From Swiss-Prot:
Source lineage: Bacteria, Pseudomonadati, Pseudomonadota, Gammaproteobacteria, Thiotrichales
Protein name as annotated: NADH-quinone oxidoreductase subunit I
Binding residues annotated for [4Fe-4S] cluster 2, in chain numbering: C74, C103, C106, C109
Localization, UniProt: Cell inner membrane
Main location: membrane
Family: Belongs to the complex I 23 kDa subunit family.
One Pfam family linked to the record: Fer4_7
GO molecular function terms listed in the Swiss-Prot or TrEMBL record: 4 iron, 4 sulfur cluster binding; iron ion binding; NADH:ubiquinone reductase (non-electrogenic) activity; quinone binding
Organism: Hydrogenovibrio crunogenus (strain DSM 25203 / XCL-2) (Thiomicrospira crunogena)
Chain positions recorded as [4Fe-4S] cluster 1 binding sites: C64, C67, C70, C113
Classification via InterPro entries: 4Fe4S_Fe-S-bd (IPR017896), 4Fe4S_Fe_S_CS (IPR017900), NADH_quinone_OxRdtase_chainI (IPR010226)
Cofactor(s) this protein cannot do without: [4Fe-4S] cluster
Function of the protein: NDH-1 shuttles electrons from NADH, via FMN and iron-sulfur (Fe-S) centers, to quinones in the respiratory chain. The immediate electron acceptor for the enzyme in this species is believed to be ubiquinone. Couples the redox reaction to proton translocation (for every two electrons transferred, four hydrogen ions are translocated across the cytoplasmic membrane), and thus conserves the redox energy in a proton gradient.
Assembly with partners or alone: NDH-1 is composed of 14 different subunits. Subunits NuoA, H, J, K, L, M, N constitute the membrane sector of the complex.
Keywords, ordered alphabetically: 4Fe-4S, Cell inner membrane, Cell membrane, Iron, Iron-sulfur, Membrane, Metal-binding, NAD, Quinone, Repeat, Translocase, Ubiquinone
Length: 163
């Protein structure tokens, strides 16, 4: 009886060993799918949600109308907006801050914006070296939007048929 149990344990162990080797051998000669980041980069979708930016109209006026929908819809409460009324009766933002540590990059702010003012770009490689620099101000977001406007416009055009 003991010999029978020892035989079963040895047989069971070898079968499992050969099954594991078969899986290893199966993938040993296939094309590798691992990307060696940062030397190699994968293509990004036009819908990729990375660093935020604020956009302007072609005449240079900022698009944000201070409706505060993005602030209301943000599940992480990462957006802070303060606004005031201008002489012509329209509202504009005086403060538009995004806390990048709180942001979960869900894209709700982008979807809620009626004038396409706040967008998320393809840029995902950024870092903060000092305390407090993780809060992006209105000026920083506008400058970032100005810098990447051509890519943002191309991504919006490519994604337009799905909106």
């Amino acid at each position: 009886m003991i010999a029978f149990i020892k035989h079963q344990v040895k047989t069971f162990g070898l079968i499992e060993l050969f099954k594991g080797l078969a899986v290893t051998g199966k993938y040993l000669f296939k094309k590798k799918i691992t990307v060696r980041y940062p030397e190699e980069k994968t293509p990004l979708s036009p819908r990729f949600r990375g660093h935020h930016a604020l956009r302007r109209y072609e005449n240079g006026e900022e698009r944000c109308i201070a409706c505060k929908l993005c602030e209301a819809v943000c599940p992480a409460n990462a957006i802070t907006i303060e606004s005031e009324e201008r002489d012509d009766g329209t509202r504009r933002t005086t403060q538009y801050d995004i806390d990048m540590f709180k942001c979960i990059y869900c894209g709700f702010c982008e979807e809620a914006c009626p004038v396409d003012a706040v967008v998320e770009t393809r840029v995902f490689e950024y870092e903060f070296h000092e305390r407090g620099t993780h809060i992006m101000t209105k000026e920083q977001l506008l400058a970032f939007g100005d810098k990447h406007e051509s890519q943002i416009a191309a991504d919006r055009a490519a994604d337009a048929k799905y909106r």
